[in-house]
Amino acid sequence: MRQKIAEQIAIGALRYFMLKVTRNSVIAFDFKDALSFEGETGPYIQYAVVRIRNIFRKGNTTPDAALADFANLSAANLGSYLAGDANEDIWSLWLRAGRRTQILEQCIATSEPAYLAKHAFQLAQEFANFYHRHHILTEEDPARKTFLLATAAIALRELVGALALLGIESPEAM
């Protein structure tokens, strides 16, 4: 298992490093930088996926269950969860997650996968901001907790999808 995870991280690091730059860029490859868990790297994005999966594991639920529960929330609750500056990161995360189709169209039109790579990195950053600001598993309001879990589920779905399109596997653990 550890060998498989190490391979996923190494291959993901290399692929992301090669895909994050546009075709006309000069590449100076540094494996140490590519394998870093900080900055614009494949492992940073893979770690975001693992972190989200751990939220669901610790919460004894699944992303699908969170989204099903979210569908049953009242619209009145949603308005209060999105109001105010304190929830700007939630808006940013949902907006970024919803842009994948637009980004893919841009990649196709320009033959540049770098746009999708950048999108995946920015989505991982948006999730990190959201995660640091909102205590998902310890949220006391059940409806708000459902909303936060659904937000994490959307981020997970979009990150895994973006990585898959880049040919990068999403490890179960790191």
Language-model segment annotations:
Residues 1-174:
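Non-catalytic interaction-recognition regions
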